[in-house]
Amino acid sequence: GGKFFLIQIASLLLYQSNNLIIAHVSGNTDVAVYNIAYKYAGIFQMIFSLIIAPIWVAARDAYIHDDISWIRGIMKKLNIIWIFFVLGSLLQLMLSQFAYDLWIGKSLNVSFYITALCFVYFILNMKAGIYNNIINGTGKVKLQFIMYFIQVVIHIPFAILLGKIWGIEGVLVS
């Protein structure tokens, strides 16, 4: 329970630190640009998260009953579903400027590059979500706990450094 709590705190630090860092290195307007691209790119992840959410409990049951073949099978199916989400995300990325024009008009300029970086983040995050749900289901969260801790320790200084060099894009690359 305590490790799950600390993982959630680390997630919060990872996800929310970008807003503060972008505001510091690039300005509040870029925070708005980042948030628009982030929200737009995150649409498919929201849907994907709904699909994989029940896997946590199912993986727990399979693990308790030593049904490793079920776990392997569901991972294979989820990876195939993930490919379709990647393709959908790429289509959504190609339509991003049109969507921004409808959504926010010409009030802000959200570059294709910033949007693409957000999509890369969410595509990788969806992939990691498959494995995180399986790991959580087995109750073996030590590796996930260590990885989140390392991510926080590395991400924040690199986001500040790269943000000072490349602006919002540097924060996203970090």
Predicted regions and their residues:
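Membrane-water interface at loop-to-transmembrane-helix junctions
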Residues: 1-4, 8, 69-85, 110-116, ...
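Transmembrane helical elements of multi-pass membrane transporters/channels
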Residues: 1-57, 121, 125-129
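Residue-level recognition of pore/gate-forming positions within transmembrane alpha-helices
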Residues: 12, 39-42, 77, 89, ...
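Alpha-helical transmembrane segments of multi-pass membrane transport and lipid-handling proteins
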Residues: 48, 75-107, 112-125, 156-160, ...
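Membrane-interface junctions at transmembrane-helix termini in multi-pass inner-membrane proteins
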Residues: 120-150
